Amino acid sequence: MAKEQFDRSLPHVNIGTIGHVDHGKTTLTAAITKVLSEQGNAEFKDYANIDNAPEERERGITINTAHVEYKTANRHYAHVDCPGHADYVKNMITGAAQMDGAILVVAATDGPMPQTREHILLSRQVGVPKIVVFLNKCDMVEDDEMIDLVEMEIRDLLTEYDFDGEGAPVIRGSALGALNGDSKWTGAINELMAAVDEYIPTPQRDADKTFLMPVEDVFTITGRGTVATGRVERGTVKVNEEVEIIGLKEEPTKTVVTGLEMFRKLLDFAVAGDNVGALLRGVDRHSVERGQVLAKPGTIKPHTVLKASVYALTQEEGGRHKPFFNKYRPQFYFRTTDVTGEVTLPEGTDMVMPGDNVEMEIQLIKPVAVEEGTKFSIREGGRTIGAGTVISIEK
């Protein structure tokens, strides 16, 4: 069967369902595909199909995630739904599923529960910009005032974690009712998708961001100079543009890209996703190395102290068998290199057990080009024992 051409005419947005266990995330995901499939904009996926999510491995961590896709009149969506709470923690911290926005599912029968709060906090830590709320199971609550109270609680909770509690759309519905074809509740799904379309911003495409390329390898072309190779992470770089070499040293080095090539062909410019070699003017073989980045001047700095949200792998995932403690010194793997760092655990946390999610401060022995949202792995003796996301830069 011939593969269908991917439609690029609609902007693409990644979203996901988050919320407490059994509040109806997976049922809602199924209901969205059902309602949109009747408009020709999705393929219906039933609950069982989504719930039996295949195991994926991302940076050595086993995550169960279901991916569905659908579209509205305005956008194409990739939607991720995870069966278990631990899967969300891992998914969001490793960036396995980058979310441009989230649908927070809260059962009107229960109101906000512990994982509701945890998922909102996680969304804040990993930089999910906007959250739309779906109040589920409204068909099981007789009293509208009860639902009003739940809505107020959720708005307060969003505000507490620096989301737009006042302005966030809150849609009342019943995912099960919509799955069963009840027109009152299929209407709520359409209302939800309209809110997602309008409220969740279209992400800036990687190509439109400022240029950054992690250096993977360096070699010399006799008579021409030094070439740094790597995959452009974001932005665009043109021949004869000035860039900075950043990381592993206190100060960046300025240089000019005098040539670009990909697959042995010369390029005028390189864009996010391209694997390229960049010829650098006046740079000797030893002043650029793997683990540094090339970037647009002034856009990213090298840092040594950062706060991060970290997930410690379980023993089954190949992680440690025992906990680690304050002042633990593993290797932190950023983009293309390992740098040793020392962990400071928050007050009141004596140790981190395999399977824990914890916020910590990290002091690196060499400066690395990082910013809020940068993902990394934690390694010990060459094996991955954790994964993290930078929450803030301290120094």
From Swiss-Prot:
Residues 60-64 are annotated as: G2. GTP binds at residues 19-26, 81-85, 136-139. Mg(2+) binds at T26. Residues 174-176 are annotated as: G5. Its EC number is 3.6.5.3. Belongs to the TRAFAC class translation factor GTPase superfamily. Classic translation factor GTPase family. EF-Tu/EF-1A subfamily. PANTHER family: ELONGATION FACTOR TU, MITOCHONDRIAL, ELONGATION FACTOR TU-RELATED. GTP hydrolase that promotes the GTP-dependent binding of aminoacyl-tRNA to the A-site of ribosomes during protein biosynthesis. This is Elongation factor Tu. The gene is tuf.
